[in-house]
Amino acid sequence: MAHTNKHYLDLPGSYFFTEINQRVNTYKKTHPEKSIIRLSIGDVTRPLVPAVIKALHDATDEMGQPSSFHGYGPEHGYEFLIGEIIANDYTSRNVHIEADEIFVSDGTKCDIANIQELFDPSDTVAIIDPVYPVYIDSNVMSGRLGKLINGIWSKLIYLPCTIENNFIPELPTQHPDIIYLCYPNNPTGTVLSKDQLTIWVNYAKKEGAIILFDAAYEAYITDPTIPHSIYEIDGAKEVAIEFRSFSKTAGFTGLRCAYTVIPKELKANTREGNEQYLNMMWNRRQTTKYNGCSYIVQKAAAAIYTPEGQKQIQESIQYYMKNALIIQNAITQMGITAVGGINAPYVWIKTPDNLSSWDFFDLLLQNAGVVGTPGVGFGPHGEGYFRLTGFGSYEDTNKAIERIQKALLI
């Protein structure tokens, strides 16, 4: 008889965002006359920009001709896209990255969940909290985090980000082997300065730890002093893997394209003390388990680096950031504490009157018809907080704010 992976049984009953959808659908069934505005799941709403659409059409036409048809592509990604990534995302910031250090994929979610396959199941994990749930769930599936006891994973090192520490995590007091950082941060919308990020790089060096750095929202940084890549920090190539995505940068949530950077000098040890290069290991993993992102999608991704593409995606980014700033300003004017919305499209709200995250969710759903994200879904230190996003339309964002103001009797 076949046996299941017992660690899957340790996962919570349903994926967090599924629970949100279930509550909303229940409300809609009992209140069919009510309109719902969603400022919850971080999906984009603006269409793909013209430069991307043209590239998709052109690449599709190529696939219809014998002379330009493409079958299986390179698992790393096509050179035409990798070259644009290097020139625009790294060389422009005085960071040297080589072509074989970039692995194009169909999504950061997949990569950041799969990367833990490279590490020993007994490695200790430190994760900022609150945080994107996939970091935790993927490690639960591998058995690294122990048991969930009163909302706390028994073997996980939590790095709290709360109002008390200005949402900047402190270095852990116990040794981690793997450290998850996400900046600009989802869900809090906060960032780390170069000095603050340097502290983490130096700490990882001292501890022999690996930083998994999720930079999916770097395109939303407006402060010129904030690093867009962890590799802007001296020595980071020795301790960090970086994850980037075109989903929020260029609206690719429905196309799926991303990339992961693993420097060739990045090493980890076996339990016997033998050094292994993680770039080689990930390459072996990808060539075994992955056939590459499609040619058509990679051509579309390359198009965002053209002058027209850059101009067009910046218009979309600025559109979303305008929405986020509207939310941030309105919430703070209500006398409610809120962070984010300046270097990220997320606004992180301290719930008023000490309401729980889910109670505040229900209040806004029932009284305003606005759907946000309960902070507790991002981890125990998200309890008492709530996330709203700038990814809606300008009209819906303003309408949602008006409804929230009325619901809170402001």
From Swiss-Prot:
It catalyses: (2S,6S)-2,6-diaminopimelate + 2-oxoglutarate = (S)-2,3,4,5-tetrahydrodipicolinate + L-glutamate + H2O + H(+). InterPro entries: Aminotransferase_I/II_large, DapL/ALD1, PyrdxlP-dep_Trfase, PyrdxlP-dep_Trfase_major, PyrdxlP-dep_Trfase_small. The keyword Transferase applies. One of its GO terms (biological process) is lysine biosynthetic process via diaminopimelate. Substrate binds at residues 15, 42, 109, 132, 186, 291, 387. The modification N6-(pyridoxal phosphate)lysine is found at residue 248. Pathway: Amino-acid biosynthesis; L-lysine biosynthesis via DAP pathway; LL-2,6-diaminopimelate from (S)-tetrahydrodipicolinate (aminotransferase route): step 1/1. Homodimer. This is LL-diaminopimelate aminotransferase. It comes from Lawsonia intracellularis (strain PHE/MN1-00). The gene is dapL.
